């Protein structure tokens, strides 16, 4: 499931490292986390929706790859991301 444009803009604004930043790993992880949360809520009512579940697994995998990249570059940023978005590791 996608997120509304205004919600996406809000997520970008709160997680951007500088003005106009949409591509940093922090912003990408935040957007993916928002989409993952939306899909998780969707699965509470639509338990048998296996096609969307596959999409959820792809999103989680992409977020994991981005987090691994951040961890390799800067451990402090990685820990801050985990803390901010309540991601288990």
Curated annotation (Swiss-Prot):
InterPro entries: Ribosomal_uS15, Ribosomal_uS15_bac-type, uS15_NS1_RNA-bd_sf. SMART domains: Ribosomal_S15. GO terms for cellular component: cytosolic small ribosomal subunit. Residues 1-24 are annotated as: Disordered. The keyword Ribonucleoprotein applies. One of its GO terms (biological process) is translation. GO terms for molecular function: rRNA binding; structural constituent of ribosome. Keywords: Ribonucleoprotein, Ribosomal protein, RNA-binding, rRNA-binding. SUPFAM superfamilies: S15/NS1 RNA-binding domain. One of the primary rRNA binding proteins, it binds directly to 16S rRNA where it helps nucleate assembly of the platform of the 30S subunit by binding and bridging several RNA helices of the 16S rRNA. Belongs to the universal ribosomal protein uS15 family. This is Small ribosomal subunit protein uS15. The gene is rpsO.
